[in-house]
Regions:
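PRPP-associated nucleotide enzymes
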Residues: 1-235
Length: 235
């Protein structure tokens, strides 16, 4: 991995999670560029080289190791890495979904972004259709995407879901199913190794996984901070 070519990291954004994924990618690019600048300055100082010429040498080495025959990008400037995997999502009029990975992801660590509570109109089929998707639609879109990523040869699959779907169905009362646990088992059977989510209120969901790791992050402070900008919380 270099700061211009993150060879093992890729992001697949489901239609519902694309806006969120794009925000994350902006921050990732900023982090990569900052780290590269620090590395470039340190190497230039250590080997007594001009920083611009060193940048050109680094780009040259990157081009030498690139598998593509057609090299793109500036010769003497930093090249921002591309994390987003080219993916085509198809929505059929009967409600079915299809996901097709359009580039090689074999051996990569893939993070799939999905926001099941995104109820805005989402452009699908290349922008030809704009549809409001339900939670069930988002979940099914996520499942077919996981399967496509797995069959494309990804080394590791992680899910980034700000809202864990069906988290309301985490306790059994009478003759009812545990859908939150069921989804966890489906994810594991599809090869998911990690799930990153926010503020799961139930320990039962976290304990329902046999193999996959679940990272339950807390966003209470960030939410209150943003709310305080538009609502007076002191009264």
């Amino acid at each position: 991995m270099t700061y211009s070519l993150p060879t093992n990291l890729g992001i697949v954004a489901c239609p519902g999670g694309e806006a969120f994924a794009n925000e994350v990618i902006v921050h990732l690019k900023h982090i990569y560029k900052h780290r590269f600048q620090l590395k470039n300055e340190a190497l230039a100082k250590r080997y007594e080289l001009d920083k611009d010429k060193l940048q050109q040498k680094i780009n040259f080495l990157g081009d030498v190791h690139a598998s593509e025959a057609c090299i793109k990008g500036s010769v003497d400037k930093y090249r921002l890495p591309e994390f987003k995997i080219d993916t085509q999502f198809t929505y059929f009029m009967n409600g079915e979904f299809k996901t097709e990975i359009k580039e090689c992801i074999r051996g990569k660590d893939i993070y799939i972004f999905q926001d099941v509570e995104n109820h805005q109109e989402i452009p699908l089929n290349g922008g030809k259709n704009k549809i409001r998707l339900s939670v069930n639609d988002h979940v099914m879109s996520l499942l077919v995407t996981i399967d496509a990523v797995r069959q494309a040869g990804a080394a590791n699959i992680s899910l980034v879901v700000p809202v864990y779907p069906y988290s309301r169905q985490h306790k059994k009362k009478g003759r009812e199913g545990l859908t939150a646990s069921l989804l966890g088992h489906i994810y594991e059977n599809l090869g998911v190794s990690r799930i990153i989510t926010l503020d799961i209120h139930s320990r039962e969901i976290e304990n329902s996984f046999n193999k996959a790791n679940i990272e339950n992050l807390h966003a209470s402070y960030q939410i209150i901070r943003e709310l305080s900008k538009i609502v007076n919380l002191t009264s």
